[in-house]
Amino acid sequence: MEKNNKEDVTPLGGYILAKDPISFNEDRPVIQLRVRNSGDRPIQVGSHFHFFEVNKALQFNRAAAFGKRLNITATTAIRFEPGDEIEVSLIPIGGKQNVYGFNNLVDGWAGKSPVAIDEPVETTWLHAG
């Protein structure tokens, strides 16, 4: 058995980076949406949050975001400062596409079927586009 050189040993708690960048979600269909924070507080949206159900103060085409999440790495988020307008990339939610919780607007399957935003949602949740 060959001994490691001092340069080859990773220190305790250390890590080794890959030579090539890691890619993800390459085979997923992506849409772009323009989102504006019309509120007076910063809003942070996590990577796997059902984007259709994000904070009411975010203005965007909610119907287009149905069944989708941010196209960012897991455990990360995008922060929208008050007045910010940001273009985001969204991809379909994976797996069985069952969405429960969040803001309880769906609580069921969020697959490819179109969504009708009913009047209570339209009047209480900002909608642009």
Curated annotation (Swiss-Prot):
Catalyses: urea + 2 H2O + H(+) = hydrogencarbonate + 2 NH4(+)
Disulfide bridge partners, by residue number: none
Answer yes or no on keyword Methyltransferase: no
The biological pathway it contributes to is: Nitrogen metabolism; urea degradation; CO(2) and NH(3) from urea (urease route): step 1/1
Q: What class of enzyme is it?
A: hydrolase
Alphabetical UniProt keywords: Cytoplasm, Hydrolase
Which Enzyme Commission numbers does its entry carry?
Answer: 3.5.1.5
Which Gene Ontology MF annotations are present? urease activity
Query: In its keyword annotation, does this UniProt entry include Cytoplasm?
Result: yes
Q: Which domain of life is it from?
A: Bacteria
GO CC term, one of those recorded = urease complex
User: Which GO biological-process labels does this protein carry?
Assistant: urea catabolic process
Main location class: cytoplasm
Q: Which InterPro entries match?
A: Urease_beta-like, Urease_betasu_sf, Urease_subunit
The subcellular location is:
Cytoplasm
Q: Name one Pfam family in it.
A: Urease_beta
Q: How does it assemble?
A: Heterotrimer of UreA (gamma), UreB (beta) and UreC (alpha) subunits. Three heterotrimers associate to form the active enzyme.
Q: Which family does it belong to?
A: Belongs to the urease beta subunit family.
Q: Which PANTHER family match?
A: UREASE
Instruction: Output this protein's name.
Output: Urease subunit beta
Please tell me the species this chain comes from. Photorhabdus laumondii subsp. laumondii (strain DSM 15139 / CIP 105565 / TT01) (Photorhabdus luminescens subsp. laumondii)
Its encoding gene is what? ureB
